[in-house]
């Protein structure tokens, strides 16, 4: 079983998961009949497992469902090869078996098995079937960090998930119903694959512009909408972000808050170039929504 785990190709990134890596060490200890190291690695494995669940099956299922791998990326574009498909099937069958392994299964292979360890739970179900359903729903559920989170910021050119996003809901927003409905309709068009516009929201501070965008992101997250907040001094990074998101099956709002310029602001030229387009073309998966607080004398 350890050799099969070491030989993962499609789900190779699972080996970087802390609990999976610790479980691999348990398998290694069983191969070596090493009870002393088995005890230590069991404590490490359960410490990592218990941070999320006491069920190994559920933990591994979640790791598989959220995996970003070549097959899920190629599936989104309809380009999974026969070889990749075969590898995927074999690995899913193995991971399903792995998710059912208990402490008793492992200690049965030790000559001097410790009797003081407390095991973990397993449960029924098929990881392979669950993953096939996830592939069919990739346009709504996503993969990798996009499967777990729906709001992101940009740091050093990389997307960073917002682990505790603003829980703002549309029904909590007062006033401006007509204006808000236009933004909602535009967002729905984006999700439906129809032409969608870039949007500029302007008005006095405290009128709910930012809250409306965050509430829309929350409302449509289950339909495959993700929000990326970009600061004004990060405008030059938008073309790279667009390239990175172009093949992603989800839909994205690039959200730029507090968009005000001085007369000699280089960011204005960057924004103008972005809106006018580039050789890369305009993505049908990304809409840009801007917030202008109308506190600058410069008109956009």
Each language-model region and where it sits:
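AAA+ P-loop ATPase mechanoenzymes
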Residues: 1-174, 178
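A short mid-domain helix/strand-loop element embedded in enzyme catalytic domains
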Residues: 151-167, 189, 193, 208-214, ...
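Pre-Walker A (pre-P-loop) alpha-helix and adjacent loop at the N terminus of AAA/AAA+ ATPase modules
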Residues: 165-199
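Short glycine-rich substrate-engagement loop in P-loop NTPases that contacts/grips substrate
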Residues: 180-184, 221-252, 265-269
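Short loop/turn elements that form and flank the Walker-type P-loop nucleotide-binding site
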Residues: 194-196, 223-224, 248-250, 281-285
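Walker A/P-loop
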Residues: 198-230, 243-246
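Conserved catalytic/switch belt of AAA+ P-loop NTPases
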Residues: 243-247, 262-300
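Walker B catalytic acidic pair
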Residues: 257-259
């Amino acid at each position: 079983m350890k050799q099969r785990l070491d030989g993962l190709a499609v789900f190779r990134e699972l080996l970087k998961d802390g609990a999976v890596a610790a479980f691999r060490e348990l398998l290694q200890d069983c191969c070596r009949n090493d009870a002393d190291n088995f005890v230590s690695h069991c404590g490490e494995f359960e410490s990592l497992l218990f941070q999320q669940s006491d069920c190994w099956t559920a933990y591994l299922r979640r790791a598989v469902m959220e995996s970003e791998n070549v097959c899920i990326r190629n599936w989104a574009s309809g380009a999974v090869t026969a070889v990749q498909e075969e590898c995927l099937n074999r690995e899913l069958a193995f991971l399903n078996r792995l998710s059912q392994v208990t402490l008793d299964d492992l200690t049965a292979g030790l000559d001097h098995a410790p009797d003081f360890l407390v095991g973990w739970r397993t449960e029924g179900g098929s990881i392979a079937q669950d993953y096939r359903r996830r592939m069919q729903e990739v346009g709504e559920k996503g993969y990798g960090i996009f499967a777990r989170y729906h709001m992101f910021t940009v740091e050093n050119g990389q997307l960073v998930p917002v682990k505790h996003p603003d829980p703002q809901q549309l029904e909590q927003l007062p006033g401006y119903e007509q204006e808000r409905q236009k933004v909602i309709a535009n967002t729905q068009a984006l999700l439906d694959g129809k032409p969608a516009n870039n949007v500029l929201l302007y008005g006095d501070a405290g009128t709910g512009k930012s809250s409306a965008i965050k509430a829309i992101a929350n409302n449509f997250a289950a339909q495959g909408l993700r929000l990326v907040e970009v600061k004004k001094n990060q405008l030059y990074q938008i073309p790279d972000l667009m390239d990175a998101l172009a093949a992603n099956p989800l839909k994205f709002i690039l959200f730029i808050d507090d968009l005000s310029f001085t007369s000699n602001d280089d960011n204005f030229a960057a924004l103008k170039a972005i809106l006018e387009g580039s050789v890369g073309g305009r993505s049908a998966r990304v809409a840009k929504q801007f917030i202008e607080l109308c506190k600058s004398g410069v008109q956009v």
